[in-house]
């Protein structure tokens, strides 16, 4: 074990302490910096006086669709305490994100979901848009960013998702009819082909990275869906059948999100009051 303060391994045990829920916490002392800490230091449970079982059940109820004030009434806590527990957990969300599996194929589905934030503004001016990316095979929720539906939101969401997936050898990037996904991904994942060793019949020089396929499914205003590949694919990248280009799993996940997260529930006064609060509820889902 390393010391969380000086990051050295000269650590010895320094007694135990029994908490209110009868849980025993081990304490340690560093011989170099002479500072004491316990096994909870640096975790969401650090310096928490409430029994861990109560915190676990409260956050589980929040992730199953119960509002913050209702959760506080059930567990005899203030709603601000519930929100502080969520903020603690959201701060450590990045540490629990596994990287994309190297040497395997990754299929990403991108979509947006809308909810009200603060005042009841038009959808174009609201900060309640949430950009989500979903890995098809593992059902892993890669990215969830809340904000106004503009180029900055698509840029941040695309960059976060690409940083997670770029380690995989084969990436399939499927979205809905929104073209700003491809526009944000093009500067990150495009490359120039060498002039030598390329067939004359292939007229393009700037293409997607080898192994990356970017396509979107357009539903169409007349009920005639079609599939469109974005930009130019690498000549050595395999193309998927049109039937596999969709974001159905992500759309189903967004529908389930409206049941599991109270801030996304329609026709109920449970919306988030600010964008930061909406992002916090997304991080703990």
Question: At which residue positions do the language-model features occur?
Answer:
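Residue-level recognition of single "structural anchor" positions
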Residues: 1-285
């Amino acid at each position: 074990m390393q010391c969380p303060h000086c990051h050295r391994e000269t650590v010895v045990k320094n007694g135990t302490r029994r908490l209110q829920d009868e849980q025993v916490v081990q304490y340690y002392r560093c011989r170099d910096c002479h500072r004491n800490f316990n096994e909870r230091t640096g975790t969401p449970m650090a310096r928490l006086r409430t029994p861990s079982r109560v915190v676990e059940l409260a956050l589980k109820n929040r992730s199953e669709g119960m509002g913050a004030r209702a959760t506080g009434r059930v567990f005899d806590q203030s709603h601000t305490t519930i929100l502080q527990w969520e903020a603690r957990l959201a701060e450590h969300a990045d540490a629990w994100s596994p990287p994309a599996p190297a040497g395997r194929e990754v299929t990403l589905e991108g979509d947006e979901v809308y909810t009200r934030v603060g005042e009841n503004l038009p959808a174009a001016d609201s900060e309640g848009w949430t950009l989500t990316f979903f890995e098809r095979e593992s059902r892993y929720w890669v990215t969830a960013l809340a904000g106004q539906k503009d180029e900055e939101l698509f840029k941040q969401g695309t960059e976060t998702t690409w940083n997670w997936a770029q380690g995989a050898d084969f990436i399939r990037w499927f979205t809905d009819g929104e073209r700003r996904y491809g526009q944000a991904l093009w500067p990150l994942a495009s490359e120039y082909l060498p002039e030598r060793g390329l067939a004359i019949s292939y007229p393009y020089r700037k293409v997607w990275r080898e192994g990356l396929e970017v396509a979107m499914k357009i539903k169409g205003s007349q009920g005639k869906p079609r599939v469109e590949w974005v930009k130019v694919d690498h000549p050595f990248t395999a193309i998927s059948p049109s039937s596999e280009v969709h974001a159905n799993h992500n759309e189903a996940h967004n529908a389930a999100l409206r049941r599991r997260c109270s801030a996304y529930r329609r026709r109920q006064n449970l919306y988030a009051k600010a964008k930061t609060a909406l992002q916090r509820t997304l991080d703990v889902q």
